[in-house]
């Protein structure tokens, strides 16, 4: 059996997801009420039978380390692991990770202990469900040295991705990084014979975007990184075209890069629809996450429509529509949420802590009585007082940092541990 090592890249600063990444790495951002983004690629690896997994971290990684260490613990009869490799300074490497390729290069010393035949390299901040065995089978059958997972996109979305040109056999012959909207890229369209074999290909999706997921033959990867290049997508893959056999693997399923506040918000809210494109309710391929042993949510006299409510919530006489309600969320009487992504809380406050809140004049963790919130992201442990109005009007406002809240991509964000006094209007 070939030895396959999975590497999940989780070291980015996630600046476009700020302030959600103010105190945590992007793959540690809560998602879907109870998960972390990094749970997605780890689950795909485990379901595919690839259980030797390294997670490369660097920026604000404490929360990510804690989550992985408390979640992915294999028994002694399984020759598998999910191990964190934090950026470190050594005699050979005195700088931090300079990019995705540089992160892998600086960890070969650790990878060599597993003596892999192949590397599967994944990103820690995407939403998809992939059988990596099919990806690997395609890699072997095509006799490729490198394989790149690709997904069909429209011309309108092409400027956000690296776009690949392939021949009739799926070999990659050209790579164009984020082509401008006014540039003619008609020659990059999916070949007709390949498009005909793509089941469920939606109209208008005529171009192939790199998903940032790769398979490398072990020796090929080491040779490809025997230089100072720092990034797979911008440098390693484009400069290897013509020198190496690089094959495209056309992934037919749902895939979304959760790299901005807009995509994060919209992808979360899409989970509340009746038939979401990505479905967490999959018996054959569940998404794993940390077991918290929380009680069932307690819901009293509420109206809840097209929403997801995670474990351990206490919701009283509230009106909730098209929203995600994360773990341990407390919502008091008369509150209304419409289009809200609420990440929940890390703990329940005790009676003594609530009494101290009264003496300090701050709200309890959760959402206070009579508060109305629309189109917002509420990060963990936020304290929102009574009769607040957040996102109620539709007036256009400049984006930026306003102290206890942020405005990004038209979405209001209440950051982690924020305090919003009673009666606030945002």
Spans of features found by a protein language model:
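Left-handed beta-helix
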Residues: 1-5, 194-204, 218-426
